[in-house]
Amino acid sequence: MSRDDALLAIDTFYNSDAFYDLLNRRVGFRTESNLPGCEAELQRYLDEEMVPYLTQMGFSCVIHKNPRADAGPILVAQRFEDDALPTVMTYGHGDVVAGYDEQWQDNMSPWEVTKSDDIWYGRGTADNKGQHTINFA
């Protein structure tokens, strides 16, 4: 894919609301790592969202149990194309801080992306589900 084709594809992805829809789906996972019992939702985020998405893009994915008992699982995804191409590495996390649903204003929810002017609200929109969505777009 040429540079121009790549820029056109990402522009189309963003302007068609596909980016919003994908990010909104990811924000919908209540991956609150600072609350007890969050491990199942963190695992579900990887199993149901990230692994299928990355696999569809040609990545091989392995989920490892975190050696820390108080931390979520670790996903390692790899896609090899050619020795002549550069290595690209990205890091991210799927957990967010507690949603504090009752503290959100104007009928907003931490578990849905809300656009207000040029600002997008929702747990994980900037840290770190937004990064996943941008990096792999």
Residue ranges and their predicted role:
Residues 131-137:
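Active-site-proximal alpha-helical scaffold in enzymes
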